[in-house]
C-alpha cells in the first residue's frame, strides 16, 4: 500500500484516488448485499486511503509554498 510519508509521487497519489473511487463505487453498487461487518471493514479501508491522500496533499501544499518564497 502507498505510504505518503515515504513516496511523494503524484502518480501514486492519483492511483490511490482512483482506488478510493473504485472502492466507493463498488460499495455503492453492492451496499444492500454486504453484511454490516464487511461494510464496516471496507469503510475503514476507504478512510485509510482518503487519509493517505490528505497527508500527501498537505505535504505537497507545503512543498509548493516553500518554492514560492
Stretches with model-predicted labels:
Residues 1-69:
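Sequence/structural signature of long amphipathic alpha-helices
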Amino acid at each position: 500500500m502507498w505510504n505518503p510519508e515515504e513516496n511523494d509521487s503524484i502518480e501514486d497519489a492519483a492511483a490511490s484516488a482512483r482506488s478510493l473511487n473504485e472502492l466507493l463505487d463498488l460499495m455503492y453498487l453492492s451496499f444492500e448485499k454486504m453484511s454490516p461487518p464487511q461494510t464496516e471493514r471496507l469503510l475503514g479501508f476507504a478512510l485509510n486511503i482518503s487519509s493517505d491522500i490528505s497527508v500527501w496533499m498537505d505535504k505537497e501544499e507545503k512543498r509548493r509554498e516553500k518554492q514560492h518564497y
